[in-house]
Amino acid sequence: MNARLSTPMNSRIPSQNLAHQAKTKRMVQLALMISIIFVMAFSPLGYLRTPGLTITFLTVPVAVGAVLMGPLAGAVCGLAFGITSLITAMTGGSPFSSMLLSINPLALAFTCLVPRVLEGWLCGLIFAALRPRFKNASYFIACLACPLLNTVLFMSSLILFFYNTDYVQGLAASLGASHPLIFVILFVGIQGAIEAAACTVLGSAVSRTLAAALKR
């Protein structure tokens, strides 16, 4: 009788171990993605800087994390991206962000963090929604959505909090923009197109390769 009673308990032990291993594996993978984001952010790998443009590739690991591990992981990767942007502003790595920090620190913190969290979360949701019906295209669409969401959400927050400041009004005047939408188009311009193309190509290629390797 004791043997019979112990059998169900013993059968649960392997499943509990497997669940623990899966959780640990997932946390390790997420930690790796966050580490990649920080390494890229503070090295030449994360940005292509030219006299007129600063193009970021940090949307690539955010998109890969969202695609491989889901919306929550995407949000965490987006948060890591936002934290690096805030650190860059605080350390003077970006003159534009540093100026916004001096104008309104709380608004800049919101602008750096919240759009990036939403970017990763929404990217994961888009992939999860499309994957059952569009197995291959879902990688492409999700990785395209990530930089587009980053641009739209970041610029929306920028317009909301900073458009009426003297600094941004000066930038708008220098670009010849008399309307917020025109300012966004001129301000983002070719930079946004390059970021979208890079994330779409690199993100979809990396995520599909890793998904196949991880059998997902």
Predicted segments with their positions:
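Loop-helix junctions at membrane interfaces
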Residues: 1-216
